[in-house]
Amino acid sequence: MNVSNSKMKSFDEYYEKNMKSLENVDNDNNNAGNSSNNNFKSYNKSFHNKKPNNKFNKDNKNADNKVNGGNNNHHGNYSNANNANNFKQQNNPSNQQVGQSYIERMTAKNRKFLENYNPKKNAKIKIIPLGGLNAIGMNITVIEDENDIIVIDCGNAFPTEDLLGIDLVIPDVSYLKKNQNKIRGMVLTHGHEDHIGAIPYILKELNMPIYGTKLTLALVEGKLKEHKIVGYKLNTVNFSDIIKLGNIYVEFIKTNHSIVDSAALAIYTKAGIVMHTGDFKVDYTPVFGDAIDLSHFAEIGRMGVLALLSDSTNAIKPGFTMSERTVGKIFDAIFNEHSKDRIIVSTFASNLDRVRQVIDTASRYGRKVAIEGKSMINIINIATELGYINIPKGTLVQTEMLKNYPDNKTVIITTGSQGESMAALSRMAQGMNKMINIKAGDVVILSSTPIPGNEKAVNKIIDELYRRHATVIYQDTHVSGHACAEELKLIYTLVNPEYAIPVHGEYRHRKEAANIAESVGVEKKKCLLLEVGDVLEICNDTAEVKDRVASNGINVDGLGVGDVGNIVLKDRQALATAGMVIIAMALSGSSSELISGPDIISKGFVYMKESEDLINGLKDVVRNSIEVYRNDNSNDWKKLKSLVTSAAEDYLWKVIKREPLVIPVIISV
């Protein structure tokens, strides 16, 4: 397959017009690339009018360099400048040679596969999202190619406020259980909880091989150990590797996100190539490792991509997501300004780039660093063992050793940036931590943004910190790990999919992502907004939702999985909002005559001593219900319980406008 000159010329024009401002990453990236859609439409006209060939191009080295990693001056700071290369060589734990193009990195086996890959006419695939849509969390997608199924990610979601007592929510995999004989494996994009958190629960029901990058699998292994799942084989994959799962082939592509070792996936099926971006951003100056492999996206785009499932989280935000390195400069300024104070930094445990920058900044300012929070300690230990974090010698100290150093010579990195009640920061703010408590003069940096639904908890912890006279800094101390609108335009343009399927976001995020895809040339009717459980079937030039499968989340409460359904939750909500009324009575076993009672017990409903009239009225209602039951000559006490419950509920609503949980207890005498 030949690469047309018009395409490459268009890419150059696109870059000059829309990305020039990225040449200096110190600038505010949010203001970069705000060109009109007309520029993108102009570019896309030449790109989309030419039908992509499904044969791989053997001679694309020059084109590959042109898109990413070449020495063209106009590519600014993300080209192969010497400084960038030196940094990458020092910090990249993988063995791949820095600066090599996608083609040069490819093994002979992979090259041969791609040369011979050609989708078949009339072949069809199914794409089934079992989670991850209309919410942030529980990401899991099924790709089905005739007799082969692969599963992409398997995450959990945190419970909403109405799920009382629930610890987390995992996906319903009933469809996978029914088709277990087709499952060839699970492939993982990265190691965040919303992508790997449900794996231990699912593996207890479904046995399948798991594939992912080094850090991702290390985190999964830790989870399996927590659940006492030992001896399970996890298969490590390097970037640009292609693995065979039945008749499906999966290629791992380097991306950037707020956790290292994140990957996009190119899935080669009989019907065509399906790409899944995973969670990603375009960061040309990452703190750790290489920048996103845009050349890889472009090469696969030239082959012809059937469908692109793309991260939509930040689709509603214009411009570009700022580089992670900008946060390091903010940290430096804060450390410089507060040189006489103790500094506490709270962030996501999995954000190793952020943790690394805090440690490096502390080391430069001669401060000792203590780590607080179980998940933070675990992840840093794993990352250190794998070589993803190099901590300067003598920088880390145990928490109990902090007392040996003056406050202005210490930094504490902790969990709890989301206001979690039992996390380390929350316990510090409430004076419940054995070793560390917040005191006047402390500088607390919240280096994250609240996950949707956590805003109240975060505001509460900020208030607690203020009450303890701490200085709280939470503005400009975080950058997102998700692509904004201009980055999505770039990816949609490079990949040039036949179908755009926005994922990972609430409906408004996915709708805006669909608009972005349309703005760069994807037909409106081919921008598909699926719902969880939809079975999308793609065959030739048609894509249609053919069916729906079970997709409600499964609630996890303690050690119980799936035993807390809607009925139990409804009872919990009733208990939480209106309390409980127990009606106890003793009846004759032969005549159903009332022998004793009814006795009324109120829990969380009303104070009995101050509600005598209400309670006496309720007793009369119960007695009347018993008489109605006896007059029917019935001998079914289930019917009596139902009669008493209904009458009591009607009475209480009529008199006091409340709906407590009513529980009748009948004793046979």
Region locations from a protein language model:
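Hard-cation-handling environments
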Residues: K317-S447, I451-G617, R623-N633, K641, ...
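His/Asp/Glu-rich metal-coordinating catalytic cores
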Residues: N92-G185, H192-N404, A423-N437, K456-N459
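Broad gene-expression machinery/nucleic-acid interaction feature
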Residues: N247, S262-A264, M580-I582, V662-P664
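Conserved beta-strand scaffold positions in the cores of enzyme catalytic domains, especially
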Residues: I127-P129, L234-T236, A307-L309, V444, ...
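Histidine-centered active-site/metal-ligand motif
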Residues: H190-H195, H257, H276, D476-A485, ...
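Conserved hydrophobic residues forming the short capping helix/wall of the S-adenosyl-L-methionine
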Residues: L224, A517, L652
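C-terminal tails and terminal domains of large nucleic-acid-associated
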Residues: N633-K641, T645-V669
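Intrinsically disordered, low-complexity RNA-associated tracts
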Residues: M1-M106
